[in-house]
Amino acid sequence: MLVLVINSMKASHLILGTQRETPSDAEVISHQLMIRAGLIRQVSSRIYNWLPIGKKVLQKVENIIRNEMNNAGAQEILMPMVQPASLWEESGRIDQYGQELLVFLDRHDNKFCLGPTHEEIITDLCKNLLTSYKQLPVTLYQIQTKFRDEIRPRFGVMRSREFLMKDAYSFDLDQESLDSSYQIMKNAYIKIFDSIGLDYRIVKADSGAIGGSDSEEFHVLAESGEDLLAFSDKSSYAINAELLTELQDEQDPFSLEGKSSPDVKGILKLKRGIEVGHIFKLGKKYSEVLNLRIQGEDTDIYPEMGCYGIGASRIVAAAIEQNHDEKGIIWPDALTPFQVALVEVNPKNKDEIKNKSLEVYNLLKENSIDVLWDDRDKRPGVKFTDMEVIGIPITVIIGDRTLEKNEIEIKRRVDEQPELVAHQDLIASIGLR
């Protein structure tokens, strides 16, 4: 069960960090709006601090992921970001990753690396944890910071050097059991992205440096996406367009548009996507090379492994790419940092307005509505601009004009005109209970 945490507060107590100017180096809208809305601040080249509003959204992503992982029977652990380089040498991936793997020496000249992924560590861990086939199948996961020394970090947190990721690893007795674990994780991913409210596609993909056999990617559709996707307009068929070489004219993936889908169900459409999840059937690649042996019924076996990753911080950026307008972010309901903004405007009688605002603030909290009370001594235009760029879906406005009539003004983020409601009808009109 996903627990809703209500964290209402006053804007005067919150480090908002909003900005009016768009950073000159921000190429895509998600990067621009994450800076302007005060979600992140850059520390170094594509390494970011997450400010209170951003951390609140990121935590909502984590909670949705954690909830579905737990529902799928996966068990949460936490592995170190710093890994012995010897494990990467043993698996052979230290050369494969090259300079993207940040390697360093400790004071005793022992070689370590900052983990971009954790296949080696989890396999080494399970040498001691898993001893018998009776413990299988099992899936372990973590939500952990990763580091990849990208040659061209760009697009804000969409392709940053440090990022937050959920990675899970399944261990199975045989291929049939792996197929089952893989499907369970795939179904969990579908629930995660459906819960968040993203328009996405599941596409056949290349396993890349992770290795293994079958793999699929989850892509959020957005013009800023770096991958070109080809998918049927009549079925669930979808693939990274670069992999569909046999249908391309002169090795041009854009030539796929309008051709018959390989599953003979519909016509191929092309759109760009942002990869936010990737699932793999690793087979015995890591269990064999790192010598993870488990006692079987008759003899020792190398377990079949699966690997399942979700970019938690990238989801935040992808959601913004898909949900914004000229004023700022329009969050999916599941990710909005606050459900309601409470704004005081033009008070002639400050005490009366303050008391009314406090009354409404407490009423919203009593009804389990997450509210940000903008009690700052700022002009109304500044307050409304901040609430719009942050993307709070509903603004409740308390002012002298409405106070005289015992009414409250409600402005929805996606509507042009506000509505006036009686005080006693506020909660029903908001419709969030």
List where the protein language model places each region.
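NTP/phosphate- and nucleic-acid-binding module
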Residues: L2-R433
